Amino acid sequence: GTVQTVEIDTPKADMFERQLNAMIPFLQDRRNSLNALKECSIKPAYKKLRGGQAQLQTTLNKSALQAKTVLLEAPTGFGKTGIVLEHALRHLQLGVYNRCIYLSSKSTGQLETIKQLRAMSADAIRYLQMRNRKEHSIDTPTHTCSTDKQCEHTSAQLWRDADIHPGKLFERGTFELENAKDIGAKNGLCPYALTKSCLPYADIWIGDTNYVFSPQSRGVFIDTIGFDPSQTLLIVDEAHNLPQRAAEALGIELSATELLFAYEELRVSGAPRRFLRPLEELSTRINTLRADQTLSSNTHYTLLDLCEDIEQQIAQIHIHWNSVPPFVTELVWRVPSLAKCLAASPQKWLHWSPSNGV
């Protein structure tokens, strides 16, 4: 091909230099991390294999070459976690993948995975356990978490003043939750945002299944700089629970009681009556629903009409959302999503009440 040199004028050149200065340290860090991974010594998951474990290792390696999706089933206590982790680490080391995501819906499962990982690789491999916003939350003179995304949008100047480089935050192969909270409190930064900023620098991500299978949470992983699904090994522990977890994540639930609490908070904050009226009526209608019943056609269209009315009001009115509790904001913005579900084809959604008033 032809190589062409294009001169850049001064303003664009300055922008180009700033972007280059931001990218080069990250790319150098990733190269160093991959080189360290290739050279590190990975210990076997078990010093002495028990009956069936050697066969499982062989079968897993063969199956992974033949198919993109592999289902592994073995009795509790068999040693699945260790065998799967060893498979993952060996393939990361060989460059078959450049990242591994390990999902478990149980915190005990995540902690057991971390314990096994440290025993096999010590501090040579960077990993990050992505905890939820509530666990990251702090209430200090410098920063108070709002438990929603507003909390993350801190001034860029605060980050520059703190001189924080995410790749340098790792200690003993990871960035602990308590370290994130300490740094956040000292510098007025959101601990959750600090942990998220470290994701591009970690070789292994450990977290809840929602970080991949929930539309509300998956952006944390999917939108991370440098993430490439085609070069990522995904491991789902306790995968038999996945259908239920996915249904919970994809479903939209509104409680009459929660709506009433939200109504009171919005009324006190001065929300206009034309917005409060359909919100109150929606709460009243939902309160009449009985457990384990599908919605009648009349109820379906009534709820749809109310939800669409509320959605329209949200677009027209002016509310200082920062002045109301985060749960109110989250609940109100759930209504437009419910409107879309109610308006969709019945084949796409089950419209029913799991319990009284829900």
Regions found by a protein language model. Give the residues of each.
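A substrate-engagement module of RecA-like helicase motors
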Residues: V6-T10, D14-K43, K47, Q93-W205, ...
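Conserved pre-motif I regulatory segment
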Residues: R30-E73
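Conserved helicase NTPase motor core
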Residues: D203-N210, S214-L254, S353-G357
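A contiguous, basic/glycine-rich beta-loop/short-helix subdomain that forms a polymer-engagement track
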Residues: A180-D203, Q216-T224, A315-V358
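Walker A/P-loop NTP-binding motif
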Residues: N61, T81-G95, Q116-R118
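Conserved phosphoryl-transfer catalytic core
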Residues: H240, Q244-Y301
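Walker A/P-loop
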Residues: Q66-H87
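Conserved beta-strand -> loop -> alpha-helix junction used to position metal-binding or nucleic-acid-contacting
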Residues: Y102-S107, A124-S137, S230-L242, L254-Y263
